[in-house]
Each structure stands twice: as structure tokens, then as C-alpha cells.
Regions:
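A glycosyltransferase accessory/donor-loop signature
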Residues: 1-33, 182, 187-301
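Histidine-anchored nucleotide/phosphate-binding helix
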Residues: 35-52
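Short internal beta-strands
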Residues: 57-65, 153-155
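Active-site-proximal specificity loops/subdomain of glycosyltransferases
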Residues: 70-117
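Short alpha-helix within the catalytic core of nucleotide-sugar-dependent glycosyltransferases
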Residues: 72-75, 120, 135-147, 198
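Short aromatic/hydrophobic "clamp" motif used to bind/position activated sugar donors
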Residues: 125
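Conserved donor-nucleotide/metal-binding helix-loop-beta segment in metal-dependent transferases, i.e.
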Residues: 132-166
Length: 301
């Protein structure tokens, strides 16, 4: 049974529905963010809508903070693209005691709330980190069919040397065959909940023995729990690139014409004023085609 009960977690819900009748063939896409990612999340949604006008998508944003201005922008975005956007303001008290780092706050655990919340509501949810920009079609994800016992479709992170490192550190030998990045999760909601993944993950994150091993918080935990129950799909759906790499003399940029989602890992994000590099272009195009078009990029503080 889930430790994240709806009545305890969801404080407020705001629905901006400008597609009057939800299509039967709709892809539900969810984000879990704190206030620092509201700007990025809005533009991420705009980028998906901009590149997938022929697909019906409904968006779900789980956050612990939203201002009236933010609500207006998300409403305007839904209206602009004749779409449906839902904002859920959540109580994070049960998550704040879990491990966190400078780069990963308790907001990283919102994906557990998301996967539990949609049980008996939707069969499939695409969870995305908010520091992404879409530049291609996601129709294959809309049409994706899970195989028996498959809990999620995922994208591998890095290379076999990294997988072997994770397998050793996390005392899970099977991870040597593949370790995924949790910024993209196409989740089979029924299988996730039948396997009690969220509850098991929280238990592990409260276990000192496990906490001493993990370095990538819920990503490490999910790799252990979902081991053998995921399908690895194309890197084009989670093409990771750190804008900080641009400071190097030579950089290998994996983003290409086939890339669907650029995932801007690392501390510098495309909404930062100093992220003025070609790789930020997909984000800036979507920003210009959204209610955030006149918002300044963030300056150094």
C-alpha cells in the first residue's frame, strides 16, 4: 500500500482545459518540480506542443509552489495550444526527511507521488524532468505497448563502464547490463503499483545501509527496484547534454536531427542568461512560442 495518500498529499488542483473533450488517444505527461523549475517546465511543455500538434497530450505539473502569475501563464499556454494542463500543489512534508543534495532537492521524489496518484486513473504516464526541450515527434510513445511484467520504458545512462560501477556500488550485479537515467520514465502505472515501487523506494531511502551506498538518490533506488522489469529504448528520447561542457576546448555533442528530447543535465540550464550556445536553441524557440516569451532569462545571482 502506498505511503503517499492523495488526501494527504494534494493540497490544491488547478485545471486549465481548453480542449473541451479529452481524446481517447491521449498521452499523459507529468512533471515534478519546485519553484526554481516553473519557468523551465512551462517552456518544456510549450516545446512538446509546438512539435506535436497532431497528437493529443494532457499535462500534469506537480509542485509545492505556484504564484498567480505562474497560473496565468500555464492557463494561457493551454489556451494557446488548445490543450489541457493540470497543476497539483502538494504537501512535501513526507518527502523532506529523505536524502537530498545541492543539485537534487526533495522535488526529485515527486515522481513517486505522480506514479501513485494516477493509479486507477490512467494506464500510462510519461514522466519527464523539467530541464528538457522537445524537438521531435513523440507519437511512438503515445502508441507504445508495454510487454508482460514491464514496469517502464527507459533510456540508458552513459556506458558499460558506468553500469559496472553502479552494479558494484549498489551490490546489484544485474545493473552491469544496463543502468537508466530517471529523467525519462514511460511508466506502466498498473505494474508500478502492483509492485509497490513507490513505497519500496521510500523504505530504501530511509534505510541507512542503502543511503550509504547511493549517490544518485531515487535514480539509484529505481534502478535497483526496476532491475529486469524495464525496456531500454532509443537515446533520442533522453539525449543528455551539460551546457557546462561548452567550456571545454573540445566537446562531443550527442544532439542530432533524430533527437526528440534534449535533457539539459548539469547546473547550467537553457533559461540562464549565460547559456548562450546553439544547444539552447530548441528551448529558446519554444520560449518564443509561449506565454514566457517576454520573460528575461535568469541572470547570475
Amino acid at each position: 500500500m502506498s505511503q503517499l495518500n492523495d488526501s494527504d498529499i494534494i493540497l490544491f488542483e488547478y485545471n486549465f482545459h481548453y480542449q473541451n473533450i479529452r481524446s481517447k488517444n491521449t498521452l499523459d505527461i507529468a512533471f515534478g518540480i519546485d519553484r526554481n523549475f516553473l519557468f523551465g517546465c512551462g517552456v518544456a511543455i510549450a516545446s512538446i506542443l509546438l512539435n506535436n500538434r497532431e497528437i493529443s497530450c494532457e499535462f500534469h505539473v506537480f509542485t509545492d509552489y505556484i504564484s498567480d502569475k505562474d497560473k496565468l501563464y500555464f492557463s494561457d499556454l493551454a489556451k494557446q495550444y488548445n490543450s489541457r494542463i493540470n497543476i497539483y500543489v502538494i504537501n512535501c512534508d513526507k518527502l523532506k526527511s529523505l536524502p537530498s543534495t545541492k543539485n537534487w532537492t526533495y522535488a526529485t521524489y515527486f515522481r513517486f507521488i505522480i506514479a501513485d496518484y494516477f493509479y486507477h486513473k490512467h494506464e500510462k504516464i510519461l514522466y519527464l524532468d523539467a530541464d528538457i526541450a522537445c524537438k521531435g515527434s513523440i507519437k511512438e510513445l503515445l502508441d507504445y505497448q508495454f510487454s508482460t511484467n514491464e514496469i517502464a520504458a527507459v533510456v540508458a545512462e552513459r556506458d558499460i563502464e558506468w553500469w559496472q560501477n553502479r552494479a558494484s556500488v549498489l551490490t546489484t550485479p544485474q545493473l552491469a547490463s544496463g543502468y537508466f537515467n530517471a529523467g525519462f520514465l514511460l511508466i506502466n502505472i498498473d505494474e508500478w503499483n502492483l509492485n509497490n515501487i513507490s513505497s519500496k523506494a521510500i523504505e530504501m531511502l530511509r534505510d541507512p545501509d542503502w543511503v550509504s551506498k547511493i549517490t544518485h538518490l531515487d535514480q539509484d533506488v529505481l534502478n535497483v527496484l526496476l532491475n529486469g522489469k524495464v525496456k531500454f529504448i532509443s537515446e533520442k528520447y533522453n539525449t543528455r547534454y551539460s551546457i557546462n561542457y561548452e567550456l571545454k576546448d573540445k566537446v562531443d555533442n550527442p544532439v542530432n536531427d533524430d533527437t526528440v528530447f534534449i535533457h539539459y543535465v548539469g547546473p547550467t540550464k537553457p533559461w540562464h542568461e549565460w547559456a548562450d550556445y546553439p544547444v539552447s536553441r530548441s528551448f529558446l524557440i519554444a520560449k518564443a512560442a509561449s506565454p514566457w516569451s517576454k520573460e528575461d532569462l535568469l541572470k547570475p545571482v
